[in-house]
From Swiss-Prot:
This is Glutamyl-tRNA(Gln) amidotransferase subunit F, mitochondrial. The gene is GTF1. One of its GO terms (biological process) is glutaminyl-tRNAGln biosynthesis via transamidation. It is a peripheral membrane protein. Residues 1-19 form a transit peptide. The keyword Mitochondrion applies. It comes from Candida dubliniensis (strain CD36 / ATCC MYA-646 / CBS 7987 / NCPF 3949 / NRRL Y-17841).
């Protein structure tokens, strides 16, 4: 039984060849030089932007709701959020394909690319930069932040003083 299984497996493996034998380095070079497909065949031209773009107003609103100050580089934040939205839409698009195929599956805007040039690293922060940012922080009453001093936190400020009623 094992011999039959081995011989049939060997026949399956050795009998089906997709490519011809490449014996010389010239044959290998010429084989690899031939282009059999193009990535442009996989991509369709944009059929209209069905995905929502993250606008600078949305970024400012999200920063305010999260309690962060407006950033100077909100274009980079907008770009990063758009990339994240592309990834999320791509993930949900693939999830929905199991139930019903999506119309925008091959839309150029919906393809998430992870390229090093798209995600350039920012300058690292050092201790001096962090201390400078901390010293420049001011409480923002619109966020519910209240300014106080250390004397406001002393133990005496939490003691209830009882006074006698004088008639």
């Amino acid at each position: 039984m094992k011999a039959i299984l081995r011989s049939s497996t060997r026949n399956l493996i050795t009998s089906s060849r997709v490519f011809k034998n490449l014996r010389t380095s010239e044959e290998i070079r010429s084989f690899l030089a031939e282009s059999t497909w193009s990535i442009s065949e996989l991509l369709q031209p944009p059929t209209g932007s069905s995905q929502t773009e993250v606008s600078p107003e949305i970024v400012k609103k999200m920063l305010k709701l999260s309690g962060l100050n407006d950033l100077k580089h909100d274009k980079s934040v907008t770009k990063a959020l758009n990339l994240q939205m592309m990834l999320i839409n791509h993930l949900y698009d693939n999830e929905q394909d199991t139930v019903t195929p999506s119309r925008e599956r091959n839309d150029n805007n919906g393809i998430f690319r992870l390229l090093a040039s798209d995600h350039l690293p920012q300058q690292p922060w050092d201790l001096d930069d962090l201390l400078k940012q901390i010293n420049e922080l001011k409480p923002d009453p619109s966020k519910g932040e209240v300014d106080f001093t250390i004397s406001d936190l002393q133990r005496d400020s939490f003691v209830i003083k009882k006074e006698k009623n004088v008639k």
